[in-house]
UniProtKB/Swiss-Prot annotation:
Source taxonomy: Bacteria, Pseudomonadati, Pseudomonadota, Gammaproteobacteria, Enterobacterales
Entry keywords, A to Z: Acetylation, Antioxidant, Cytoplasm, Oxidoreductase, Peroxidase
Organism (species): Escherichia coli (strain K12)
Annotated region described as Disordered, given as residue ranges: 1-27
Induction: By elevated osmotic pressure in the growth medium.
Gene Ontology BP, a term: hyperosmotic response
Keyword Acetylation: yes
Descriptive protein name: Peroxiredoxin OsmC
Cellular component GO terms held in the UniProt record: cytosol
InterPro entries referenced in this protein's UniProt entry, alphabetically: KH_dom-like_a/b (IPR015946), OsmC/Ohr_fam (IPR003718), OsmC/Ohrsf (IPR036102), OsmC_Ohr_Peroxiredoxin (IPR052707), Peroxiredoxin_OsmC (IPR019904)
Length: 143
């Protein structure tokens, strides 16, 4: 079974003065503004890197919940941040690293079991699998 989800972008103009909007099939994002100014100058709006970060954090959290459940554990909370690094390389830019940081509360799990599961979630998350950048993971098991 293949599931298809769609994101859409509209762009007008050159790279510095142009502007665009991004939308999602679900409507959660509906013509949200983005542009050079929101990506590089801190203006209000979104940018591709924060959208990738949000998608990666969400995917990782769900993968971790699934794998914990398969091992007989139910997390009470998973809070994940994905810090996406965009660096100047050669003549352009590249996402060079994504640092996942996750704080997780799981009753009854020991640190060794948790470490094995969270590392599998990092590798098994579909978004992790599609990204070429180095993906790091920092986590804290909350008691």
């Amino acid at each position: 079974m293949t599931i298809h989800k769609k994101g859409q972008a509209h762009w007008e103009g050159d790279i510095k003065r142009g502007k665009g909007t991004v939308s999602t099939e679900s409507g959660v994002l509906n013509q949200q503004p983005y542009g050079f100014n929101t990506r590089f100058e801190g203006e209000k709006g979104t940018n591709p890197e924060e959208l990738i970060g949000a998608a990666h954090a969400a995917c990782f959290s769900m993968a971790l919940s699934l794998m914990l459940g398969e091992a007989g554990f139910t997390p009470t909370s998973i809070d994940t941040t994905a810090d996406v690094s965009l660096d100047k390389v050669d003549a352009g830019f590249a996402i060079t690293k994504i640092a996942l940081k996750s704080e997780v509360a799981v009753p009854g799990i020991d640190a060794s079991t948790f470490d094995g599961i969270i590392q599998k979630a990092k590798a098994g998350c579909p978004v992790s699998q599609v990204l070429k950048a180095e993906i790091t993971l920092d986590y804290q098991l909350k008691s």
